[in-house]
Amino acid sequence: MSTRERQISTTVLVIGTGGSGLRAAIEVAEHGIDVLAVGKRPRQDAHTSLAAGGINAALGTMDEGDSWQQHAADTIKESYLLANPHTVEIVTQGAERGIRDLERWGMDFAREDDGRISQRFFGAHTFRRTAFAGDYTGLEIQRTLVAKAEQLAVPILDHVYITRLLVRDNVVFGAYGFDQSDGTRYLIHADAV
């Protein structure tokens, strides 16, 4: 096993290269900020790729009466009132933008004959709001996000398992981990993690 160590500095470190991590890294890169994404799995094989059912947003493509407010109400009800209402509001208000971003970046959503994104019922929804790509929605989301991150030249470290956050005076300033394939240690300093 190697005892090599790499030291890296970046403005923003994103830990995780699944859907959320890559989406965050893309947002940072689009604002012209130096970002590094680190994932313990190969970028094409993050857990997002296993999601099959679809992704929810009140687009109104199938049911014009749908809204982010109804999406939020359905989410809170289905959580048995355990979901944080503020978080639910943020997620449901931003869901349409997420779908539109994926669409703009080339995601191959299922479509109706007239070209609208197809949506179906899923879970406890009042309206049809699950957009999908066959039964491989998560894989298509992951492929789309990886392609966009690569287009923006976001550096991605695969197979690096983060074991420790670096903290001083209650401020996180980096992370420490190792490459699972060759043991190389990584010391990553960042202004934001």
Region locations from a protein language model:
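N-terminal Rossmann-like FAD-binding beta1-loop-alpha1 element of flavoenzymes
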Residues: 11-37
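Anionic group-transfer/hydrolysis microenvironments
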Residues: 13, 41, 193
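Residue-level recognition of conserved structural "scaffold" positions that shape functional pockets
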Residues: 23-25, 60-61, 130, 190
